[in-house]
Amino acid sequence: MKIKALSKLKPEEGIWMTEVDKPVLGHNDLLIKIKKTAICGTDVHIYNWDEWSQKTIPVPMVVGHEYVGEVVGIGQEVRGFEIGDRVSGEGHITCGHCRNCRGGRTHLCRNTIGVGVNRTGCFSEYLVIPAFNAFKIPANISDDLASIFDPFGNAVHTALSFDLVGEDVLITGAGPIGIMAAAVAKHVGARHVVITDVNEYRLDLARKMGVTRAVNVAEQKLDDVMAELGMTEGFDVGLEMSGNPSAFNSMLKTMNHGGRIALLGIPPSDMGIDWNQVIFKGLVIKGIYGREMFETWYKMASLIQSGLDLTPIITHHFKVDDFQQGFDIMRSGMSGKVILDWE
């Protein structure tokens, strides 16, 4: 049986609608009928066919890794799922036999394979993944929100790396993940949550999500904002979401002594760092990749159920046949999360 899918068919800019074989269910797998998918920044990199994509992505391949769907097939070894369960899923497929996997630190697996990056993705009518990777969505969480659990998980993993209660938090980079991290920080009790960017559309979106201040660093100095807020000692926690060297270095300058930084944004490999700031301030820097399995997922569901409102971050919906419009708006930078409807 042939099904509809969005694939990287050629080693050049673009993503194409195509037909592929329906995936085959393995003994330990679930077959998921896709309801909605969201376009990730990673998918935009793959669309643009940048240096990272050229080194990483096999062609041809179905892409995508942010989704919600319904279980329609269950492998014979699988327990704990039923036909009709609504699920999203962890996009990092881990080996199960390295030291970190066996020690319960699966997010640190050294043999991680990415759905829609190293193997067939979710931008199709059906997806097969290991049942271990599926996460049941509580009934009171919408399909829209469930479809963005993967990037929301990046935000939650980054934000909850350190205690935020009563702390002043600086977030550099107001992409969807940065904005969601800001909303999480505010929800769990941070005092001042300041987010920086140069994209006014995204900063406005951050304001709608309740940040203390959204700062356009092309027009305003961070030092002035700190003074206006009555901050005398610098930020306690930094969440770096941009991969931008000047953003990271301004974060280092404005951190308090003993401050803690979580890095999710991917900087150029030759980024210069003022290490004196790190050493003499006694800063702690932690790299973040993916989500903790599955602690982050439980936290995500609980945060939404306890009143965290992420709905403003979802700005556009398109039918899957209009996927090109979705990619165009994502590439313009004038969007939050963009959802493609497969039903």
Swiss-Prot record:
Major place of residence: cytoplasm
Q: EC class of this enzyme?
A: oxidoreductase
Q: Where in the cell is it found?
A: Cytoplasm
Give cofactor(s), names only. Answer: Zn(2+)
Q: Might you give the EC number(s) for this enzyme?
A: 1.1.1.103
Q: Which Gene3D superfamilies match?
A: Medium-chain alcohol dehydrogenases, catalytic domain, NAD(P)-binding Rossmann-like Domain
Q: Which NCBIfam families match?
A: PRK05396.1, tdh
From which organism does this entry originate?
Vibrio vulnificus (strain CMCP6)
Record protein name field: L-threonine 3-dehydrogenase
Q: Which residues bind Zn(2+) 1?
A: 40, 65-66
Report the InterPro entries cross-referenced here. ADH-like_C, ADH-like_N, ADH_Zn_CS, GroES-like_sf, L-Threonine_3-DHase, NAD(P)-bd_dom_sf, PKS_ER, Zn_alcohol_dh
| GO biological process entries | L-threonine catabolic process to glycine
Marked site, Important for catalytic activity for the proton relay mechanism but does not participate directly in the coordination of zinc atom, at 150
Record function comment: Catalyzes the NAD(+)-dependent oxidation of L-threonine to 2-amino-3-ketobutyrate.
Q: In the UniProt record, does the keyword Zinc occur?
A: yes
| Family note | Belongs to the zinc-containing alcohol dehydrogenase family.
Binding positions (NAD(+)) = 177, 197, 202, 264-266, 288-289
Subunit composition and interactions: Homotetramer.
According to the UniProt entry, its GO molecular function terms are:
L-threonine 3-dehydrogenase activity; zinc ion binding
| Positions of the catalytic residues | 42, 45
Q: Which UniProt keywords apply?
A: Cytoplasm, Metal-binding, NAD, Oxidoreductase, Zinc
Might you report a single GO cellular component term?
A: cytoplasm
Q: How is the cofactor bound?
A: Binds 2 Zn(2+) ions per subunit.
Residues that coordinate or bind Zn(2+) 2: 95, 98, 101, 109
Reactions catalysed, as given in the entry: L-threonine + NAD(+) = (2S)-2-amino-3-oxobutanoate + NADH + H(+)
